[in-house]
UniProtKB/Swiss-Prot annotation:
Entry function: Located at the top of the head of the 30S subunit, it contacts several helices of the 16S rRNA. In the 70S ribosome it contacts the 23S rRNA (bridge B1a) and protein L5 of the 50S subunit (bridge B1b), connecting the 2 subunits; these bridges are implicated in subunit movement. Contacts the tRNAs in the A and P-sites.
Family: Belongs to the universal ribosomal protein uS13 family.
Keyword Lipoprotein: no
Protein name according to UniProt: Small ribosomal subunit protein uS13
Gene Ontology cellular component annotations, sorted alphabetically: cytosol; small ribosomal subunit
Region annotation (Disordered) ranges: 94-118
InterPro entries named in the record: Rbsml_uS13_C, Ribosomal_uS13, Ribosomal_uS13-like_H2TH, Ribosomal_uS13_bac-type, Ribosomal_uS13_CS
GO BP terms: translation
One term of GO molecular function: tRNA binding
Alphabetical UniProt keywords: Ribonucleoprotein, Ribosomal protein, RNA-binding, rRNA-binding, tRNA-binding
Quaternary assembly: Part of the 30S ribosomal subunit. Forms a loose heterodimer with protein S19. Forms two bridges to the 50S subunit in the 70S ribosome.
Top-level division of the source organism's lineage: Bacteria
Amino acid sequence: MARIAGINIPDQKHTVIALTAIFGIGRTRARAICASTSIAEDAKIKELSEAQIDILREEVAKYTVEGDLRREISMNIKRLMDLGCYRGLRHRRSLPLRGQRTKTNARTRKGPRKPIRK
C-alpha cells in the first residue's frame, strides 16, 4: 500500500478512485492531479513506480487535505459561532443553516425527539 498524505492508498484501485480515499480530494481534483502529473487515470496504484508515487505525494501536498482541512473547517464554524451571525447561531443551536423548514423534518440535524413533559 502506498502512503500519501498520511493515508494508506488502496493498491487494487485505479489512481483516480484511490486518491479519493484522502479527505479533501474528490473525483474532480483527483483527475486534475493525474492530468498535471501525467499519470494515467486508469493505472492501478500497484502498477505505479516509486518515482510516480513521489510525484503524486508532491502534488497532493500542494492542497489542503486531511487534518489541516478538518481543522480549517472547524475553525470556520467556530468563527461563525463567535461572530454571532445567523449561521453561527444556527450552528450553536444545532439547527439547519440554509433556510430549510424545522416545524416538521430536520430530525437529522435536531437529533431524536425529546419527550413532552406534563
